[in-house]
């Protein structure tokens, strides 16, 4: 395309997000004859980004972002998050394209909004479209008693959770099976055999619109001696 301009700057509209362009700038004299020319590359900001993977660790949560092409269409990420316990918005800027970590505390869901941004000159341009996630740390289980054939566990409630799913790995099985979804923070596994290990993990669930979000999980072993 061609843009006629007598000023020292021009605005090009209707470009695609996250796309590299080559722009040729030509200076013309009063007769319309080219007297100099320069070609420059530019890129537009991605409107939205994707998360490659994410995980919780002690006191923090890490997001690994999917690589964009061209990579220089993103400088970093603006991250806005709040916990279901405090309801206080926190905003952080991360000058990285690949991975970032936010601090979190246990026993609460967090709403996380991730916006890509691009720095041109001294100005930061932030996308108006966010990638949204609801995250929560792992649930820590505590033994709450046992009989000759059963064992009970309990856990602290997670702020913002609607319910909890209990998964058991029975002896001889290589995978966990969901056995119950409950609003309680207490569970008893019955029919246990002595000197036999059972796997258990509890996951907090939060429903938002048509999607259910889950906390991270940690597997524990249970056994009756």
Q: Would you name each region that the model predicts?
A:
Residues 12-32, 103-123, 189-210:
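Beta-strand-rich modules
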Residues 17, 30-47, 120-137, 207-225:
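Extracellular fibronectin type III
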Residues 21, 72-77, 110, 162-165, ...:
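Short beta-strand/loop motifs in extracellular/secreted proteins, especially
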Residues 27-29, 57, 67, 81-83, ...:
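Residue-level signal for short segments within beta-strands and strand-turn junctions
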Residues 46-54, 135-144:
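Proline-enriched interdomain boundary motifs that mark the N-terminal boundary
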Residues 57-59, 120, 147, 183:
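Structural motif
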């Amino acid at each position: 395309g061609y843009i006629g301009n007598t000023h020292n700057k021009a605005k090009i509209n209707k470009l695609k997000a996250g796309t590299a362009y080559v722009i040729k700038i030509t200076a013309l004299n009063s007769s319309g004859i080219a007297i100099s020319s320069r070609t420059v590359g530019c890129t537009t900001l991605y409107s939205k980004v994707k998360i490659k993977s994410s995980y919780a660790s002690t006191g923090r949560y890490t997001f690994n972002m999917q690589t964009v092409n061209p990579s220089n269409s993103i400088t970093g990420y603006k991250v806005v998050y709040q916990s279901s316990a405090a309801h206080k918005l926190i905003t952080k800027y991360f000058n990285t394209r690949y991975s970032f970590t936010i601090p979190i505390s246990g026993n609460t869901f967090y709403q996380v909004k991730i916006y890509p941004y691009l720095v041109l000159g001294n100005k930061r341009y932030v996308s108006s479209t966010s990638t949204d996630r609801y995250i929560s740390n792992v649930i820590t289980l505590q033994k709450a008693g046992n009989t000759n054939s059963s064992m009970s566990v309990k856990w602290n409630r997670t702020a913002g959770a609607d319910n909890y799913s209990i998964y058991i790995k029975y002896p001889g099985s290589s995978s966990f099976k969901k056995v119950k979804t409950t609003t309680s923070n207490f569970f008893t596994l019955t029919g246990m055999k002595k000197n036999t290990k059972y796997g258990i993990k509890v996951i907090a669930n939060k429903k938002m619109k048509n999607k259910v979000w889950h906390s991270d999980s940690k597997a524990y072993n249970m056994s009756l001696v």
